[in-house]
């Protein structure tokens, strides 16, 4: 049992990195940002599997050892418990005076009748009682050990069902811009983490369209100005063969659809940039999610345009919902809502590496092999746009316009087929724990000693297995009730 407790503590400690470092399964964008901000440390953490803490080898090893240890505890204890349930209560000790709550009563009632009455009364109080000559031995509280076994068995059940759910379930993340939708298919996810036994058939067809995203920010309290109060994503869901339905997703209030839970993880802005070639033809016009960098949603983003212009163009920029110029001359956002939206872009030309067959990060731009044509080190200054502003690109490449700034939401889709079983076992864990903590395991003996003058002395005593602060009172209370049943007068 000590080994199981040690492993349980070790498992809790091993789970700490999962709450300190962003996880690929729940916050892939956060992982990207963390790696960009800590390139040296992230290499070590990645090698150790910290970004996938709960599926790492070391975490799984602790998990499996705990599972084996619990089974090793439960099986022998269960056998011992069943043997104890079938066994008779132990014989009455020779000297009850050494036991807790010892008390005596004098009676003229026949010893056999007194003991038989005690046995009957003990059975009514839920004791298993057995007669031994002129004494009765009784015990109760086996439900305490039953609760203990239920607790440990249910804990094993939780571990098993979590493993099954992880094996057959999946999690996926998708960034969805206002006015757009996504379908529950593999190709629609930005990142997807299937279980070991996942099958495509587990993806129930449905779609979620984000109609609007409504944030509420603090505007009255100057000390908390701009602090988020509430987020609401208004969506339209469609299941195969059913009519579209309106729904909302809030933080900690997921949407239940198609056997999945859809959580609202994050949000931000997705500026719509429209680029035209020198002839005025639109070569690029779509929203691009910019990743928030602070509480006021100053956001960083990358736009890549591989086709339609004389050269491939990559742009790296910042978006400020409420732009304000600092004393240093730099821009910063002072409020997370759209009050003075401003987009700044550094423009690069060259091979973006999109045609070499290797995957690239949509949120990063490798500028080592590119030429900056607008920005801090270029002849042309950084491009600065407000909504509706249009500016010519350097070198006569065309024009660029900030058309609109919709919001985007980051959705996490979670499917766990064992969720109901996990909940059921969790309830059993709590029930078993409470039972094992609050139901006392105790024994009570009543012994009749015959005197030479024909009188009978009744001795009462008890014994607890573990702490039982109410045992003495229970023995005294039973002695009083037994005396009352026999018609004895008890002096106060």
Model-derived regions: residue spans:
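Solvent-exposed, non-transmembrane regions of integral membrane proteins
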Residues: 1-492
């Amino acid at each position: 049992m000590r080994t199981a407790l040690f492993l349980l503590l070790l498992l809790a400690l091993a789970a700490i990195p999962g709450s300190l470092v962003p996880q690929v399964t729940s916050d892939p964008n956060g992982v990207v940002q963390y790696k960009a901000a800590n390139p040296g440390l992230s290499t070590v953490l990645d090698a150790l599997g910290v970004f996938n803490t709960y599926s790492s080898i070391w975490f799984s090893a602790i998990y499996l050892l705990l599972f084996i240890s619990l089974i090793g505890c439960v099986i022998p204890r269960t056998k011992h418990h069943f043997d104890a349930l079938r066994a008779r209560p132990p014989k009455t000790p020779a000297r009850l005076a050494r036991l807790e709550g010892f008390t005596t009563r004098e009676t003229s009632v026949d010893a056999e009748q007194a003991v038989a009455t005690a046995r009957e009364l003990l059975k009514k109080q839920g004791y298993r009682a057995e007669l031994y000559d002129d004494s009765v031995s009784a015990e109760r509280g086996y439900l305490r050990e039953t609760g203990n076994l239920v607790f440990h068995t249910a804990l094993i059940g939780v571990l098993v069902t979590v493993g099954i759910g992880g094996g057959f379930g999946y999690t996926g993340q998708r960034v969805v811009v206002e006015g757009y939708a996504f379908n529950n298919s593999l190709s629609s996810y930005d990142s997807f983490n299937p279980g070991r036994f996942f099958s495509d058939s587990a993806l129930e067809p449905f779609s979620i369209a984000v109609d609007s995203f409504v944030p509420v920010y603090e505007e009255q309290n100057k000390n908390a100005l701009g602090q988020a109060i509430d987020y609401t994503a208004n969506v339209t869901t469609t299941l195969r063969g059913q009519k579209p339905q309106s729904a909302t997703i809030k933080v900690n209030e997921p949407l239940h659809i198609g056997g999945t839970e859809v959580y609202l993880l994050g949000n931000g802005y997705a500026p719509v940039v429209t680029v035209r070639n020198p002839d005025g033809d639109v070569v690029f016009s779509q929203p691009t999610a910019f990743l928030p960098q602070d509480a006021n949603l100053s956001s960083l983003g990358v736009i890549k345009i591989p086709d339609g212009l004389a050269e491939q163009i990559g742009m790296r920029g910042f978006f400020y919902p409420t732009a304000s110029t600092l004393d240093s001359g730099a821009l910063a956002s002072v409020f997370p809502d759209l009050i003075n939206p401003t987009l700044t872009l550094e423009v690069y030309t060259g091979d973006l590496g999109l045609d070499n067959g290797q995957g690239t990060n949509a949120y990063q731009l490798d500028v080592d092999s590119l030429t900056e044509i607008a920005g801090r080190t270029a002849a042309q200054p950084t491009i600065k746009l407000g909504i509706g502003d249009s500016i010519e690109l350097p070198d006569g490449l065309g024009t660029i316009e900030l058309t609109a700034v919709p919001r985007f939401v980051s959705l996490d889709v979670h499917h766990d087929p064992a969720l109901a079983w996990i909940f059921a076992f969790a309830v059993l864990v709590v029930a078993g724990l409470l039972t094992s903590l609050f139901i006392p395991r105790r024994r009570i003996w009543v012994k009749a000693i015959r005197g030479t003058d024909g009188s009978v002395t009744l001795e009462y005593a008890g014994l607890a297995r573990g702490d039982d602060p109410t045992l003495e009172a229970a023995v005294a209370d039973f002695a009083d009730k037994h005396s009352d049943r026999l018609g004895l007068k008890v002096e106060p």
